[in-house]
C-alpha cells in the first residue's frame, strides 16, 4: 500500500504542478493537424535530448534549449505551468508543432515536454522504444494508467518508476483534455506530455 500511495503522490504532484488551467483557447481543435507520426518523432527526439540526456543537469538542459533557438517563457507562462514551484521553461517552434519544455525544481525535480494534438498519438512505439533503452537494467516497474481531474482537465497518466537510494525516478506520459462539460467539436484537442521526474524527499 505504501508503494501505491507514493505513486499516487508523484502523479498528483506532476499533474497539479504542471497542468495548465483549462483555457478553452489552448484546447481548440486543430484545423490542419500535423502528421501524428512526424509530430511524435520530433517530440521523442526533443525529450530524449533535453530530458533524458541533459537533465537532471539543469544548465545542460538550458544550453540545449539555447542551441535550438528556443524562446524562454515569461514568468507568467512558467507560473501557469508550475504554479508556485521554482522552475523555468521554453517555447520551441518545431517543424511539426509547437512544443513547450519545462524544468521544475526539487523536490519533484522534473523535465517535461508537451505538445497539443488533435488526438492521442495512435502508435506510441517510438516513445516506448526510447523509454525501454533508458530504463534498461534499472529495475523500473510499470504503473497506471491512472486518471484524475485538475483544473477542469481530465488527465490520464502512466509510466515506470524505480526506487534508487532513497529517491524515486519516474518516466511518465500524461494525456489531458477538457472535462466532458467543457469539451465540444471546437475544443477537443489533447495535450500530450512526457515527463522525467526525480523525487528526493527532504
PLM features: what roles do these ranges have?
Residues 2-11:
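Bacterial N-terminal signal peptides that target proteins for export
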Residues 12-18:
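Bacterial N-terminal signal peptides
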Residues 20-22:
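N-terminal signal peptide c-region/cleavage motif recognized by signal peptidases
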Residues 151-202:
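Glycine-rich, aromatic-bearing surface loops/beta-hairpins
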Amino acid at each position: 500500500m505504501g508503494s501505491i500511495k507514493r505513486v499516487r503522490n508523484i502523479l498528483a504532484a506532476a499533474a497539479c504542478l504542471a497542468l495548465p488551467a483549462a483555457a478553452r483557447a489552448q484546447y481548440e481543435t486543430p484545423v490542419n493537424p500535423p502528421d501524428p507520426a512526424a509530430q511524435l518523432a520530433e517530440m521523442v527526439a526533443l525529450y530524449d535530448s533535453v530530458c533524458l540526456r541533459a537533465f537532471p543537469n539543469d544548465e545542460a538542459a538550458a544550453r540545449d534549449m539555447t542551441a535550438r533557438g528556443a524562446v524562454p517563457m515569461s514568468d507568467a507562462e512558467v507560473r501557469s505551468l508550475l504554479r508556485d514551484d521554482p522552475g523555468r521553461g521554453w517555447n520551441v517552434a518545431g517543424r511539426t508543432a509547437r512544443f513547450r519544455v519545462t524544468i521544475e525544481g526539487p523536490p519533484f525535480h522534473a523535465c517535461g515536454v508537451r505538445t497539443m494534438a488533435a488526438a492521442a498519438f495512435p502508435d506510441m512505439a517510438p516513445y516506448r522504444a526510447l523509454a525501454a533503452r533508458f530504463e534498461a537494467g534499472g529495475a523500473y516497474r510499470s504503473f497506471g494508467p491512472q486518471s484524475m481531474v485538475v483544473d477542469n482537465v481530465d488527465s490520464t497518466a502512466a509510466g515506470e518508476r524505480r526506487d534508487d537510494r532513497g529517491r524515486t525516478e519516474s518516466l511518465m506520459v500524461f494525456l489531458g483534455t477538457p472535462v466532458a462539460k467543457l469539451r465540444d467539436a471546437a475544443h477537443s484537442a489533447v495535450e500530450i506530455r512526457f515527463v522525467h521526474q526525480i523525487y528526493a524527499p527532504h
